[in-house]
């Protein structure tokens, strides 16, 4: 079993299944109940509703566990059936193929809890919690250290995996530890050093582990009004420099030091360039937006076109920050 990173009662499988309605008669749709949990695996579940691009086909199998036990059961099911596993958080850094994804997609959006330790200044957060919502909650408590994250459009799990960052700060700066599950359901706790953090990446990317929660070191005891005001400044900066009026995945490419990917794309004359419903944003060239009716393959072809144009002009091959899942067809 391979796991892709865009988590009671341990159950045993076999699981029972029943037939359900399927809009695609060429593919059988079913629900698989995992014994010992309130969890069910659905087949042929459309993923477009769960990605920020609002594109993508169906997952061969899809599950959204509500607790660690159900997540462990889902992983065991995948292991016993030799299924590839893809972990889905907010879907904000993903491009899912129009053809969908094979294997089991595990959505962590229902794994939600937050625990503040007011003595140590540490906060432990479940993988499915929203980063922007947390930034506001933490600011209102008067805790510093998370203000920069208010504009990160994702969940804690995804942010830990990709070392999300903004405003010269990143997850690695404040992470104490991350709790992860291995394919057999074993719980591990890893430090930032063990995660091998680098710019917008970690050893979790492409690994066989799923993040369930993370603990961060913050600084309590500040004026909530001051921290909230700083958080608002970070949010306003992103609103004025990044497109929020159309669906996107956030930044498409990593910045190739010492350059900005957006600057290279803009200087290549690509602002506003469009393929199908996918367009290079006018406000920020490192964003591709869905202007309406875009297909995942439109976005994929636009990514490839940008890479070709920038490499031809600057001899720099831009590396995608967005993770592409499934099969795509180049134009």
Curated annotation (Swiss-Prot):
Its EC number is 1.3.1.98. It catalyses: UDP-N-acetyl-alpha-D-muramate + NADP(+) = UDP-N-acetyl-3-O-(1-carboxyvinyl)-alpha-D-glucosamine + NADPH + H(+). Keywords: Cell cycle, Cell division, Cell shape, Cell wall biogenesis/degradation, Cytoplasm, FAD, Flavoprotein, NADP, Oxidoreductase, Peptidoglycan synthesis. The lineage of its organism: Bacteria, Bacillati, Cyanobacteriota, Cyanophyceae, Nostocales. It is found in: Cytoplasm. The keyword Flavoprotein applies. Belongs to the MurB family. GO terms for biological process: cell division; cell wall organization; peptidoglycan biosynthetic process; regulation of cell shape. Transmembrane segments: none annotated. Residues 54-221 form the FAD-binding PCMH-type domain. This is UDP-N-acetylenolpyruvoylglucosamine reductase. The keyword Protein biosynthesis does not apply. It comes from the Bacteria. PROSITE patterns: FAD_PCMH. GO terms for molecular function: FAD binding; UDP-N-acetylmuramate dehydrogenase activity. It comes from Nostoc sp. (strain PCC 7120 / SAG 25.82 / UTEX 2576). GO terms for cellular component: cytosol.
